[in-house]
Structures are given as C-alpha cells and as structure tokens.
Amino acid sequence: IGSGVESMSRAPYAVPKPERGFPTGNLVMYDTTLGWRFVNPKMQALYGTESMGETAENLAEMYKIPREEQDRFALLSHQKAVRAWDEGRFQDEVVPVPVKRGKEEILVEQDEGPRRDTSLEKLAALRPVFREGGTVTAGNSSPLNDGAAAVLLVSDDYAKAHGLRPLARVRAIAVAGVPPRIM
C-alpha cells in the first residue's frame, strides 16, 4: 500500500524543539505551507531549500524567461488542459474515485487546476508571489492544492484470489532528476 496526503490549505506553523529545557529569548516559528519545516543548515548549504515557486524563479532567471512569455505559456497550458478534459482525452488516464461527504457520495473525476476563464489580461494583473521583483505568479505557476492518493499494488494472482478488480496497471517506470534548486 502506498499513499500520501498534501493539505496546503491547512499546513501548520511549526516550532522546533528547543536545545534545552527552558529556552530564553524568542523561538523561530516556520510556516510549513511552502518549503522545508526545519532547515538543516548542512542540507541547505548543499542543496538549497527553495520551494517549487522559488525554483521556478531560479529557472526564469537562469534562462532569461520574461514574465510575458511565462504568462503566454500558462494561458496555453490552461487552454490545452481544458480542451483535453472537454474532449475526454484523460478518460483512460484518470480513475474517478467516489468520496463520501457525510451521507452523500460524490465522484471526484477531474483536476480542478485548469482555469477555463483565464486570459492574458488576468494573468498580467497578478503580482509575483515567490520573490520580490520576480516573475512567477499564482497564475503562471503550479497551483497550491490539497490532494491525496493511495494505491494497493498486488500481483494478478493475488487480485484474482481476492476478487479484486484492477483500476490501473503498471506498464513501465522511469526515473529522472535535476539539481534541487532548478526542479
């Protein structure tokens, strides 16, 4: 069984454990919505602790990608995603999941990220959110969403023996990576 939850809307503020029983002075409190909870100085020196939005700023600076180009790309991305959903192109890739809300059951079957109503004007009106004087906004970056996923991975024999009907099959895997400051 593999699972995970990310609740960006309810990420807590965290205070690290003090080094001694009754510390004097002020304690540092971390906002855990973006980035690391408790920064290890050695890890920070080696890899950085930038959030995804900050790494996008690093890439924009490194490759000299202007704000207008980012907004145009974001608009096209939203338009393509909305069109793909409308045309049913994700039908074979997304498994609708029933979720109980009290006595009612709803079917979660679509990503809420793509904005049907966005425009270049709306994107241009947004302020940078990750860096003073930056170019990455809430409209041209990945959204901060709540989400969860779980998977039960079993063999065909196990599924048959227990009357399980597969929702998906693992056909292949791949691994790739880049330095953390430009992910």
Question: Positions of the model-derived regions?
Answer:
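Flexible glycine-/small-residue-enriched beta->alpha junction loops
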Residues: G2-N58
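Conserved beta-ketoacyl condensing-enzyme motif
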Residues: G2-T24, V94-Q110, P180-I182
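Active-site pocket-shaping loop/turn-to-helix segments
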Residues: S9, A14, M43-S51, E61-L75, ...
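Helix-loop junctions at the membrane interface of multi-pass solute transporters
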Residues: E57-Y63, K80, A84
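Phosphate/pyrophosphate-binding loops at sites that engage ATP/ADP/AMP, CoA/4′-phosphopantetheine
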Residues: L59, Y63-K64, A159-G163
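N-terminal extracellular/periplasmic Venus flytrap/periplasmic-binding protein-like
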Residues: E69-A161
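Glycine- and Gly-Pro-enriched alpha-helical subdomains that act as flexible
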Residues: V154-M183
